[in-house]
Amino acid sequence: MGIGENGHIAFNDPHEARFDEEAWIRQTSLDNVCRQQQVNDGEFGTLSDVPETALTLTIPALMSCKKVICIVPTGRKAQAVRQTLCGPVSVACPASVLRTHSDATLFLDKEAAELILTI
């Protein structure tokens, strides 16, 4: 999986994420930051092409995996990486919950890691 520019995982956006859901799949509304990322990543041509809702695995479903691997490229995600690793575990940055998983690995490029690297 990946981490979104707004700290989402799957389509669990900050305004919609819940750590205690019972369902494993749900329909969710996508915020404009998440929708714009779909354009930035080349998935859609324009913002108006991106659906406003999507189906997503919930956070409990993602966290139930034995191993979690996240690939997080580009400097556009540097702030989200910082919030994930250094901020509080909170639905304000859904990816922060990955810190509570017993076997989660993040693969970052230099640009995505730029706000957590100390030189």
Regions found by a protein language model. Name each.
Residues 1-119:
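Conserved phosphate- and dinucleotide-binding cores of soluble alpha/beta proteins
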